[in-house]
Amino acid sequence: GVSFHVGSGAEDPKSFVKAVEDSRFVFDQAAEVGFDLKVLDVGGGFSEDTFERFAATLSDALDEYFPPHIRIIAEPGRI
């Protein structure tokens, strides 16, 4: 699978959208050479103040770029 960590203290939820888009690209590249990736591990960047907003943005991006059979692991980091 693929893992990304946006980083603690992220201030722009679009950084998660970009990370999901980049992950989709990696999944597609892997498929082109015969790998069937099944896991996406997302993490970092969430704080108590931004958790709700960032989680909603991340959820929307995951729905747009990944089918339901992909296993998503979320590691929010320090909250």
UniProtKB/Swiss-Prot annotation:
Matching Gene3D superfamilies: Alanine racemase
Residues the record lists as binding pyridoxal 5'-phosphate: S8, G45, E75, P76, G77, R78
EC number, as in UniProt: 4.1.1.17
Annotated site residues (Stacks against the aromatic ring of pyridoxal phosphate and stabilizes reaction intermediates) in this chain: H5
Record pathway: Amine and polyamine biosynthesis; putrescine biosynthesis via L-ornithine pathway; putrescine from L-ornithine: step 1/1
Disulfides per UniProt: none
Domain of life, source organism: Eukaryota
Inhibition and activation profile: Inhibited by antizyme (AZ) OAZ1 in response to polyamine levels. AZ inhibits the assembly of the functional homodimer by binding to ODC monomers and targeting them for ubiquitin-independent proteolytic destruction by the 26S proteasome.
Any one Gene Ontology molecular-function term assigned to this protein's record: ornithine decarboxylase activity
Chain segments annotated as transmembrane: none
Recorded GO CC terms: cytoplasm
Top enzyme category: lyase
One matching Pfam family: Orn_Arg_deC_N
Cofactor: pyridoxal 5'-phosphate
Lyase found in the keyword field: yes
Reactions accelerated catalytically: L-ornithine + H(+) = putrescine + CO2
Keyword Cytoplasm: yes
Example GO biological process: putrescine biosynthetic process from arginine, via ornithine
Localisation: Cytoplasm
Keywords associated with the record: Cytoplasm, Decarboxylase, Lyase, Polyamine biosynthesis, Pyridoxal phosphate
Family designation: Belongs to the Orn/Lys/Arg decarboxylase class-II family.
The protein's assembly and partners: Homodimer. Only the dimer is catalytically active, as the active sites are constructed of residues from both monomers.
Role summary: Catalyzes the first and rate-limiting step of polyamine biosynthesis that converts ornithine into putrescine, which is the precursor for the polyamines, spermidine and spermine. Polyamines are essential for cell proliferation and are implicated in cellular processes, ranging from DNA replication to apoptosis.
Protein name: Ornithine decarboxylase
Organism the protein comes from: Paracoccidioides brasiliensis
Gene name in the database record: ODC
